[in-house]
Amino acid sequence: MTATTAAALLLILAVCDLALFPSLIMLLRRSGFTQLIREEGPDSHKTKAGTPTSGGLMLLLNVLVVCLVYVAVTRGHGLSRIDIAALLFVAINLLSGFLDDWLKERKHRNDGLLGYQKILIQTLAAALFFAVGNPGLRGSVSLGATVLLSGWWFFVIAMVYAVGMVNAFNLTDGLDGLLASTSLPVFAVAMAEAVAHPSGLAGLLPAAALAFDIAFLWFNGPRASVFMGDTGSLALGSVFVAWTFASGQELASLLVGGLFLVEALSVMIQVSVFRLSGRRRRVFLMAPIHHHFEKLGWAENKIVARFFVASVLFVLAGVLVMTAWR
């Protein structure tokens, strides 16, 4: 797909999303898909109760459109095993996120799927992704001419990475506009890389995510009119993971998605220290780390703006790795 075609597709998707979001928001509100707030969360979040959620459903439409356009451009001869694996991976995580949002609405509390159920579904989705896409995956990670990881170890680490990164995106979705704004430069670079070095439909899925982010920010900026819910956050993480392995940018993705890894690591550190200290010590006032800054008194829009800047810096560092060791 040429840069012109990709840009036109992105523009059309973003404009269509902007036009369709008001109807989706109304539908979600009427269907009872509204946000429930945890009691232990920051006090400022309690005013957000009742906001429509599961706005990530719009991303499903974008993925379908990108898929149809790709099939049309390649005349039906371009779909590879990796592309099919990527579509399955994104679809399973998006639907599991929607199920989680739906269960929260049905139970009338902020607890949908149990933690182990989420991890099990995500692990199965990742296993399916690598099983279906394996013949077309490189199966190794290299730095220049040096092979750092290969064989079974590659797939073991890749599974952990896939599940971890999907959850990292989910953990970042905690403030109005935070995940959409921080993932926007990530998907912009991923899309540019996919156009410069084509890697099939899986490589173009970031275009669907980028268009979603652009439109979603219009309605999710403080104060939010809609939340993406687990439906959106898990799907965005899945798109990033699919692009990572389809493009062979495993090392660079650690930097491109660095901000999300920081969010996930803050939770891991907090939980580990809390348990090892006999529930007496915490490293952060609250985890993920964006809530730590909330507790310090930072305004929500300041946190979002500064995390966006941090994400841009991580992405630029990732671009250096992409260009230096491709």
Task: For every predicted segment, state its role.
Residues T2-V262:
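"…together with the soluble PPM/PP2C metallo-phosphatase catalytic core" -> "…together
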Residues A317-R326:
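Juxtamembrane boundary at the C-terminal end of a transmembrane helix
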Residues E39-K46, I303-L313:
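Short linear loop/turn motifs
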Residues D100, A287, T323-A324:
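Short flexible/disordered coil segments
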Residues P22, R29-R38, G258-R306:
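Membrane-proximal soluble regions of multi-pass membrane proteins
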